[in-house]
């Protein structure tokens, strides 16, 4: 989501017509194969997303970045391993992500959420209004980290193009939340 906001600004402020965003994460090399608390949550993934200027395309309707204090080391990539406090990450989703989505989601058709995994994704969906279309694909890919939203958009591209207003919401690593509202 942060890369998309940056690409949007570059295209609109610097007369660039196209920008390629590439994401890639290989968390498997940092996860202990015997750690059953983290191993099932993360997948390796990569994406390449071409952002192209169109006069009648989506326009920015608002954005927000929120960084949460990381003093408790709830999700940290240390030298050769990942440490995660699962309950603290779920707390982030419920106490920080949900209220921000509710503030930003007025009049949107669809919310494209980071695919954090079954538990967090289902909790978020249950806390948000049923009036939103909230597609998921964590069942197929797991948590693709920075590639989760690009892959989700690719899988739902026909529907994405039909939407009038959408909200993209990335959250997680570094305990941050980023929202980008787009509309036609």
Model regions and ranges:
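Condensing-enzyme catalytic core mediating Claisen C-C bond formation in acyl metabolism
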Residues: 33-95, 99, 161, 171, ...
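Short beta-strand segments
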Residues: 19-25, 51, 168-172
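Claisen-condensing/thiolase-fold acyl-transfer catalytic domains that form or cleave C-C bonds
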Residues: 1-15, 109-184
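Flexible, glycine-rich active-site loops centered on histidine and acidic residues
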Residues: 14-43
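General beta-strand structural signal in soluble alpha/beta enzymes
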Residues: 21, 62, 134-136
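Flexible, glycine-rich phosphate/dinucleotide-binding loops
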Residues: 28, 57, 69, 120, ...
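Short, well-ordered amphipathic alpha-helical segments that serve as non-catalytic structural scaffolds
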Residues: 92-105, 152-156
